[in-house]
Amino acid sequence: NLKDLLIEPDTAFIKKLKAGETDKKMGIELSIPTFRLAGLNLYKAITDNKINISKILFKDATCKLLMGKKPKKIVKHNDDKEFNIDSIYMKGLDGISIGKIEFLRNKFEIYDLVNDQLIVNNKDLKFELKDFFLEELKGNNDYFRLHLENLKLELLKEEFMVPGGNYNLNFERIYFSMADSILEIDGLLLKTTYNDKYELAKKLKFTSEIYDIAVEKIKISAFDLEGMIKNGIYIIDSVAVKGLHLDILMDKRLPFNTDKRPKLPNQSLKQMRSPLYISKISIEDSHLKYQEKYEGYEEPMTAILADLNAQIHFATSVKDSISTGKSMTVNLQSNFMEKPPLHVNFIFPLDSRADTFYFEGHLASAKMNEFNKASEPAIGVKFIKGDLKEIKFSGSANPEISKGSMTMLYSGLEAEVDKKNTEKDKNIFLCWVANTVVHASNPGKNNKL
């Protein structure tokens, strides 16, 4: 056993790190009150030069990463000295095997020295690493290969403060198995640190998304971890998301950031720096609620996709994959406003300079007043009565233009149009709705659209 192990940089190094006067990007403070080795056979270690440890325990330890200013000078290190899991130099040993490394009640922090603030903090970090060992390379004395084929990792019930201090990230369990090529995340939560989301909105300069996210389970299968580590290439067969509950709020009373141009999914993929290939992403049994708060309306505009399922295929930034001409596809099924079934299909060509994507969809029958939570705050239209028979739509869009067609069949429509809000009077869609509701039915008496 080792007690009260402390590793920390001196004040002179911290001062230089903060000012960017060192070639290092960060420093480490490490405090380990309890460090314990179990199952170590000293006799075998001495006679055979092999170390076998059944368990290593780190208890109540604190690891703090100190982030400084970007270094003014970058020192290029010799490639021969870089760490390589296939060739690790350790003189005087014939092998090391570790059954389990356990971290119990530990703390992890990232501290920004420049802005004097804590940007990442967890409360009770506990996890296990299992089944890995070092094997001496044949014909290369004192050089070893780190075997991770049977590595397992499990983390339980962690909470982190996300950089910026506006969100907390929690999860019930993270499990990773190298042999099975599986990463599972259970009970993931991303919640604002404010009980009232509008209090967070007051801190924002421009209108921006405020999230609440809960996910029952995420499972990532059949991925090449070695390729990720060695070459920075992310190849994944499938990502399965179950029980996603995504709430998004935007306070439209704040100004829009005209310098911010959100990218389309196909644009974002093609502009990724790291090569990514995901064969399939599936979302099941999920729920999306999107809200916008407008001036003059007590309740926010609310759009809901309930019982949401989606399938995404061929999400890639790999140039060789893009050059095949194959498109990324998204197929979505849900109940709009928790009532009528909605089906939407997207096609995102990746090998295209115009970045145009295509869509088509269908909304089934419903009572028109079921859409009031969306229509009244957003476009100033309140449906009194009427029956929607169906809506069919299709079109295409890119960052510059969009075009398409929509057919809406309805009967017995009666609605009120709010013309008090001058901004909404300028809305082209509002003008279309105002003209539409003059007609009580579509098709009309002569069965003409």
Stretch-by-stretch model annotation:
Residues 1-4, 42-44, 49, 53, ...:
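Elongated, acidic membrane-bridging lipid-handling scaffolds
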Residues 65-67, 197, 248-250, 415-417:
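Outer-membrane beta-barrel proteins
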Residues 71-78, 202, 254-261, 378-379, ...:
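Flexible, surface-exposed loop regions and adjacent strand-edge segments
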